[in-house]
């Protein structure tokens, strides 16, 4: 019997997997993009581990006429500029990627969104893999985040995060950032092609399985695209880019992909001492 492979080659651009190194990716046609990474081996879940999303459920087809659309499936963020770019607010169970240069204000924007949503009665869980709780608290105080329904967690293990989401049952989850997250059954480093792909896949299952909206923060490369495999943008429902010059106060938010709205809208913000304000 053939021995199972311990490593494989992944295209950094599109995530294509190959048993051997290739000069050109047969899918995205880019050159010299393959990196060797460990292959995830199937593991039996240990006793007490959180079950996979949707495990044990029976798949039953539903007629389209039986599917109801409720206006409450969209939630205003408290920012009219953001709501317009999203297409009239947040869609329940959606997975939204927010990309931008480090330090441009992605975390500040989402922390203010958390404040608005929690103030409106939503249960919000902000998960940081880059800052300590004290650092988040300092930033939260600066922008006036004092509401009670806003939970914070410093964690990078997505299997642990899965359990925390299942127990706390939030309406909205923020993952800051996807490049710091990892799956236990993937032996490559956080931020690698396989880690980013599998981490996003689990977050997608959580969003759809629990009906929770998840925002993923992603840093961009010098080429201006989200770091990690391009397949990441194909997996999520919405891709937003937060752009601007760190030496200038103005920021622009635009959608390059949106399954629930237009990609022709932009939102304009101004960075002030106490956070972002709409223009």
What do these predicted regions represent?
Residues 49-143, 162:
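The Walker A/P-loop phosphate-binding site
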Residues 79, 140-167:
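Short glycine-rich substrate-engagement loop in P-loop NTPases that contacts/grips substrate
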């Amino acid at each position: 019997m053939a021995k199972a492979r311990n490593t494989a080659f992944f295209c950094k651009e599109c995530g294509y997997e190959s048993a051997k190194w290739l000069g050109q990716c047969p899918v995205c046609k880019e050159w010299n993009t393959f990196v060797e990474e460990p292959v995830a081996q199937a593991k039996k879940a240990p006793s007490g581990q959180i079950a996979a999303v949707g495990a044990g459920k029976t798949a039953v087809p539903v007629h389209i006429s039986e599917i109801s659309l409720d206006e409450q499936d969209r939630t205003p963020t408290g920012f009219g500029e953001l709501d317009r770019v999203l297409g009239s607010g947040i869609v329940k169970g959606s997975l939204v990627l927010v990309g931008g240069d480090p330090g441009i204000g992605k975390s500040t924007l989402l922390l203010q969104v958390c404040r608005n949503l929690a103030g409106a009665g939503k249960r919000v869980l902000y998960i940081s893999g880059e800052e300590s709780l004290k650092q988040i608290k300092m930033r939260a105080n600066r922008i006036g985040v004092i509401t009670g329904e806003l939970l914070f967690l410093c964690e990078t293990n997505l299997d642990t995060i899965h359990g925390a989401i299942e127990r706390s049952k939030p309406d909205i989850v923020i993952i800051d950032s996807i490049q710091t997250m990892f799956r236990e059954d993937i032996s490559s480093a956080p931020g690698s092609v396989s880690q980013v792909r599998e981490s996003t896949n689990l977050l997608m299952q959580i969003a759809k399985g629990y009906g929770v909206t998840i925002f993923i923060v992603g840093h961009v490369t010098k080429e201006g695209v989200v770091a990690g495999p391009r397949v990441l943008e194909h997996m999520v429902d919405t891709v937003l880019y937060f752009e601007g010059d760190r030496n200038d106060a103005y920021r622009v938010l635009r959608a390059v992909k949106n399954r629930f709205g237009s990609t022709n809208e932009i939102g304009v913000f101004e960075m002030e001492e106490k956070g972002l304000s709409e223009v």
